[in-house]
Amino acid sequence: MLYAIIEADGKQMWIEPGKYYDVNYIPGEPGDYIQFNKVLVLRQENDIYVGKPCIQSIIIKAKILKHLKSKKITVFKIKPKKNSRKKQGHRQKLTRLLIEEFYNQI
């Protein structure tokens, strides 16, 4: 089993090649390729490599599939005894990435 734990946009993600993941918006056109070089843990077959803090020689190649928005959340603020109400909605922009391959930079 091949998997890696990477840091992307300040968050840690468990990823596997051939699967897609939704992350916070990354500028770029659908079809563009991006690379992640902050690999914290890598597992190949029976070997586990742990970075201190990152594994410098491993790069992960991902393809931008599309941009989308998350589900809408509603924020409703009320101030007691003041008849003050404020309703607000928010949809986070996301980018769907397809993890294509892990490769060694050396």
Swiss-Prot record:
Q: Where in the cell is it found?
A: Plastid, Chloroplast
Per the record, the major location class is plastid
KW Nucleus (keyword) present:
no
One of its GO biological process terms is: translation
Q: Which UniProt keywords apply?
A: Chloroplast, Plastid, Ribonucleoprotein, Ribosomal protein, RNA-binding, rRNA-binding
**Looking at the UniProt record for this protein, which Gene Ontology cellular component terms does it annotate, in alphabetical order?**
chloroplast; mitochondrial large ribosomal subunit
User: Assembly and interactions?
Assistant: Part of the 50S ribosomal subunit.
Q: Hey, which family's this protein in?
A: Belongs to the bacterial ribosomal protein bL21 family.
The entry's function note states: This protein binds to 23S rRNA.
Q: What is this protein called?
A: Large ribosomal subunit protein bL21c
